[in-house]
Amino acid sequence: MKSLLLLVLISVCWADHLSNNYTLDHDRVIHIQAENGPRLLVEAEQAKVFSHRGGNVTLPCKFFRDPTAFGSGTHKIRIKWTKLTSDYLKEVDVFVSMGYHKKTYGGYHGRVFLKGGSDNDASLVITDLTLEDYGRYKCEVIEGLEDDTAVVALDLEGVVFPYFPRLGRYNLNFHEAQQACLDQDAVIASFDQLYDAWRGGLDWCNAGWLSDGSVQYPITKPREPCGGQNTVPGVRNYGFWDKDKSRYDVFCFTSNFNGRFYYLIHPTKLTYDEAVQACLNDGAQIAKVGQIFAAWKLLGYDRCDAGWLADGSVRYPISRPRRRCRPNEAAVRFVGFPDKKHKLYGVYCFRAYN
């Protein structure tokens, strides 16, 4: 009891001491900051932005500070942009800014900068977009011990196409699948890209690698050889397989190109080697599979003549189905991988613009 009384007397004396030394004037305000209250808030006005290969895009990001928070405005603002990998396990550095100091990383060098529309604008501009730029980006703003983030998805206009090499179906491990797409002016597709293609009508009964290492395939018309006739349409998922040992096809993604895709008018049919040389003689190169799909899907290219492509396959693009030219649906028709010495086909060429 005596201890409690002594504690009360000490508290009263300490309060009197404070009141004699510190008076609350009209111009003096005490701010009590809630421990869990946000002192720095980062927001993206759009969760997803759209563009195309070769274009420019702004990834939106703004930050808001509590000016009444203790220490607000005394630290330099650090803005960091990273790209999230498809499996979300890693982040790839893109751009960092703090005051006058700025740094870009890797393939983004010379192509990215802050928009700087206002003092609280952390939006990132990416120029001359590549296929690899597709994905999710994280905007992180740091002030002292405070930080917050926002995520923006960059989507590219383009087309997904299934691919397998001359060796036949189910012959690519994951790493070979990645290279196969690159060789055809494309990149390995993401699940989101395949899903969007399925919603757009893509139906393919062979499983292929996706960028996250999963193996899947899209079915719009269920049938016995493709998961069963009584199943519902959807993207079938085989799961994740050994990237070195497991072998499947691949789904590739490509977008707009900066050049001209065309069927070469030639007086005779050509062998593969003659086709390659004919394009070179015309100031071009033999076209790749990704380029014929991009021309068909994005430009509406239509030609009922089978022609050689760079991988040794023979195909032709039909945008307006008609008799003798894929009468049932618009598609890039696949003839096959014929003997390269056969003198039976024309050639599709591609001339890049400088």
Curated annotation (Swiss-Prot):
Occurrences of domain Link (ranges): 159-254, 259-351
Location within or outside the cell: Secreted, Extracellular space, Extracellular matrix
Cellular component GO terms held in the UniProt record: extracellular space; perineuronal net; synapse
Gene Ontology BP terms: cell adhesion; central nervous system development; skeletal system development
This protein's UniProt keywords: Disulfide bond, Extracellular matrix, Glycoprotein, Hyaluronic acid, Immunoglobulin domain, Repeat, Secreted
Limits of the Ig-like V-type domain: 38-152
One Gene Ontology molecular-function label: hyaluronic acid binding
Propeptide: 1-9
Disulfides per UniProt: 61-139, 181-252, 205-226, 279-349, 304-325
Glycan attachment sites: 21, 56
Entry keyword Repeat: yes
Any Pfam family: Xlink
Family (UniProt): Belongs to the HAPLN family.
Described function: Stabilizes the aggregates of proteoglycan monomers with hyaluronic acid in the extracellular cartilage matrix.
Listed name of the protein: Hyaluronan and proteoglycan link protein 1
Species: Sus scrofa
Biological classification of the source: Eukaryota, Metazoa, Chordata, Craniata, Vertebrata
